[in-house]
Design a protein with these regions (language model features):
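A compositional/structural signature for long, glycine/proline-rich flexible linkers
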Residues: 1-264
Length: 264
């Protein structure tokens, strides 16, 4: 079970035997964001594919999860058909056919450790440096990333800025500078409960359902705030992640989440 999921994209995934090679073919996307990451069995990601064409998959581990994200407009029911057509054009060809056997984890111990690491890791305020290729990530940072959000994209493909937890005791507001990204990237805010789960269908802000200022900046409201734009409902211990896909990393070095102000 993966915490801190999102509804920005449709996911498709397959666990494959990599020992006999594999290829992935991506069709033209007509400007829509589509990425495919290869998550190896030790949770490192050496390959992320965005360009149309046929790509060779390589892995240091015998098994890997090939995970595709396709940008979705959750405000448009008709968008499902366009996504289905695009997904049908993606081809994954795998030489091996061995089955992956999941270890028999002690789930009580696993969840307790995950929660402890999440508390420590979220104090950093960003998930930068928590995912990437073998040999590029500090082991402790990689462990934090695995606990906070399994399947994070590497820094060059996405940035994740996480908030602390807040009380469900009124209305909060924050003013955000325009998040820096390259096309076909985008940004979003997704809200979670204290344990990292999505608890409402209305828990996301992105370009399809929010109002932006002319310069791309925006105000967001959290909780019972009356008739305001960009308002997300809250529960006790609510928190959020600002995701930036295809980020401009040089501009993100100084980018931080704004102060959260309690206004009522």
């Amino acid at each position: 079970t993966v915490v801190r999921m999102n509804r920005d994209t449709y996911y498709s995934a397959a666990v494959i035997d990599t020992t006999q090679g594999a290829t992935l073919t991506i069709p033209e996307t007509n400007g829509r964001y589509l990425s495919v990451m290869v998550v190896q069995n030790d949770h490192y990601i050496d390959q992320v594919f965005l360009e149309p064409g046929t790509h060779e998959i390589t892995s240091d581990t015998d098994f890997a999860m090939v995970t595709m994200r396709i940008r979705a407009n959750q405000s448009d029911p008709g968008d499902n058909d366009a996504i289905a057509a695009l997904r049908a054009g993606v081809k994954l060809e795998v030489g091996g056919n061995a089955s992956h056997v999941r270890p028999n984890y002690d789930m009580e111990q696993l969840v307790a450790l995950r929660d402890e690491l999440t508390v420590e890791g979220t104090k950093l305020g960003t998930l930068m440096g928590m995912q990437g290729a073998h040999g590029t990530i500090e082991p402790m940072m990689h462990l934090y990333g695995t606990a906070i959000g399994w399947g994070l994209l590497p820094d060059a493909q996405a940035q994740y800025l996480g908030s602390p937890k807040f009380a469900n005791d009124g209305c909060y507001m924050a003013s955000y500078a325009a998040p820096p990204f390259n096309e076909p990237g985008f940004f979003s805010i997704t809200i979670y409960d204290a344990d990292g789960w999505i608890y409402t269908e209305d828990g996301i802000l992105n370009e399809f359902n929010m109002n932006l200022n002319e310069d791309g900046s925006f105000d967001a409201y959290f909780g019972e705030c009356g008739e305001v734009d960009n308002n997300l409902p809250t529960v006790e211990g609510w928190n959020y992640i600002l995701r930036i896909y295809e980020p401009r990393l040089d501009e993100l070095q100084e980018f931080r989440l704004p102060e959260m102000k309690k206004i009522s």
